[in-house]
Amino acid sequence: MKEQIEKLYEKYRRGRLKAVIICVIAYFAMMGVVNMFLGSPFPHKTQILFMETMANGWINTHGYLLILCGIIGIIVGMGSILYQIIHDFEKFDKILLEECDTKKYLELMEYAVSYGTEIKPKDFQKSVFTLAQQRYVLALMAEHCFPKAMAYLQNHWQGKKTTNLYRNTALSAQLVSSFENRNGEEFAGLYQKGEKLFRKNGIFLGKKLFLEGKYADAVELLQNIQKKTNYQEVQRQYMLAMCYEALKETEQASICMEYVAKYGNTTPCRYAAEQWKRENASVVLSETMIE
């Protein structure tokens, strides 16, 4: 996998040239579309009834379309390369999202950042490096290395810290860290600050309700979240287990912990689930016998 990281950086070493080529192709393609509706772009002879006359061409009559075609070409050229970079990262993200292997993912993203620093990225390699940094921080969070994640964001992040990518990553790190510390007041403030960002992830709202002591509401919310990735499902099941335990529903908590222990792979919550099962085995057994 490390070789694939190196190939990814090499692939976009001349990314700007690829973007220019795509931009030019898109530019002329857009001009072709305009030609279909407005005719030739250049001055030309045309015949109206029995008279021959000169037509200005749409470059003279609708010159703004030339600029518009150029803008669209630039957007398509740049956007296509950035889309390819994001798409290329998806095969690495599957290690976390589908395999739930947080240790392997962290090792890989750590190498991606280290290698990117070593080669001094140029051109679109800078975009690859920025996404590698973001995923490295997310990998640290997934491994519950919260102080290290915050330290990297504050002291070692290379690039602008005013971008949405940096701000959202930093906010996510602060939010997860505050939950780990069970700081309900801080968590609520951070959640409100980034509500639009976290609205699509019901697990964050479930954590907010948990810290507020609204365990039944959290259970109802978490039960209605549809599975998107294996990693999210493991996180959802673990949160449900925590809520059930708080509600003294040990048997339900045990079912959720069993799922986490089985599918959690190398995630920290898997080890926590296994420990919980060992510590509560007698309680679960007694409740089962009573029923």
Whereabouts are the PLM-identified features?
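Hydrophobic alpha-helical transmembrane segments
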Residues: 51-73
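Transmembrane-cytosolic junction motif
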Residues: 6-15, 39, 73-103
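Membrane-proximal helical linkers
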Residues: 82-127, 148
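Residue-level signature for tetratricopeptide repeat
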Residues: 94-98, 139, 173-180, 208-211, ...
